[in-house]
Amino acid sequence: MKKTVFSGIQPSGTLTLGNYLGAMKHFVSLQEDYNCYFCIVDQHAITVPQDRLKLRENIRSLAALYLAVGIDPSKATLFIQSEVPAHAQLGWMMQCVSYIGELERMTQFKDKSDGKEAVSASLLTYPPLMAADILLYHTNIVPVGEDQKQHLELTRDLAERFNKKYNDIFTIPEVQIPKVGARIMSLNDPSKKMSKSNPNPKSYISMLDDEKTITKKIKSAVTDSDGIVKFDKENKPAISNLLSIYSLCKGASIEEVEAQFVGKGYGEFKESLAQVVVDTLKPIQERYEQLIQSEELDHILDQGADKANRVARKTLEKAERAMGLGRKRR
């Protein structure tokens, strides 16, 4: 029997090249060997204020991007979190087995609430909902970046706590952090992760950026002064980041890319890198344009929600029975 993989991405604006190389590209190969659930976590997105129309647009755009990169609805389940009510229901039950202290210790909560007068309660209770997302599908593996590892450890703790107190309902998931590409860094500050939330658009490449924009951003990416195209994360973090992008887009090893640019400067390297990135994103963008306003996209999301609802409902009912919720039914 195939193992189950669950992954959720927030619909908070266009995804970056870092999201693609660090996560989505990996998802395409995962769907061949695993039972995959890819969830657009719109309920997580509203932990911070959202414009209603923009959120709807982002949800649809993210769904189209999932499919455009190669997620196949006949092999994987793609759905929207809020269209499966069991997520919020089990999320509440997970809150009931969580402790305030452990939620306050979450690094992301500390970072996002730091210095703010009014903090949404949902920012604190985000991890129990994330635990529910994962546990509903008897997930074995969760592919995440380093920044989500702490939340995953809490998910495991909550599942074990629930199983011990009530019944063995949940599968304890394993964390999987991809070796390469898990962290593509910012183009203008290699100490920070490439992120669409960075106020400087030159720091990231959006998956929907056109050729001219991509070329411009790569040309303006920071480097160092020695002019040698060599991978050295400690002493040459900026060039090492650009080499990682080249290697992942081209499907070549770092050593092969280094060999290609022996005796050549950063200008030539950046020119070639820009073309490699454009060639990687172009077919994705073409498929995205076909999907974004199509009925096909709605049909796929309807099918995904139906399948996810069937599986999630069964798990929820078992958990409710274990806790003594509702009425006993024959």
Curated annotation (Swiss-Prot):
Keywords for the protein's UniProt record, in alphabetical order: Aminoacyl-tRNA synthetase, ATP-binding, Cytoplasm, Ligase, Nucleotide-binding, Protein biosynthesis
Domain of life: Bacteria
Reactions the enzyme catalyzes: tRNA(Trp) + L-tryptophan + ATP = L-tryptophyl-tRNA(Trp) + AMP + diphosphate + H(+)
GO cellular component, as recorded: cytosol
Subcellular location: Cytoplasm
Annotated EC: 6.1.1.2
Tagged with keyword Cytoplasm: yes
UniProt-annotated binding residues for ATP: Q10, P11, S12, G18, N19, G145, E146, D147, I184, K193, M194, S195, K196, S197
Disulfide bonds: none
Protein's GO biological process: tryptophanyl-tRNA aminoacylation
Motif 'HIGH' region location, chain numbering: 11-19
GO molecular function list: ATP binding; tryptophan-tRNA ligase activity
Residues reported to bind L-tryptophan: D133
Residues spanned by motif 'KMSKS' region: 193-197
Pfam families: tRNA-synt_1b (PF00579)
Function (record text): Catalyzes the attachment of tryptophan to tRNA(Trp).
PANTHER family for the chain: TRYPTOPHAN--TRNA LIGASE, MITOCHONDRIAL
Subunit structure: Homodimer.
Family that this chain belongs to: Belongs to the class-I aminoacyl-tRNA synthetase family.
Name of the protein described by the UniProt record: Tryptophan--tRNA ligase
UniProt source species: Halalkalibacterium halodurans (strain ATCC BAA-125 / DSM 18197 / FERM 7344 / JCM 9153 / C-125) (Bacillus halodurans)
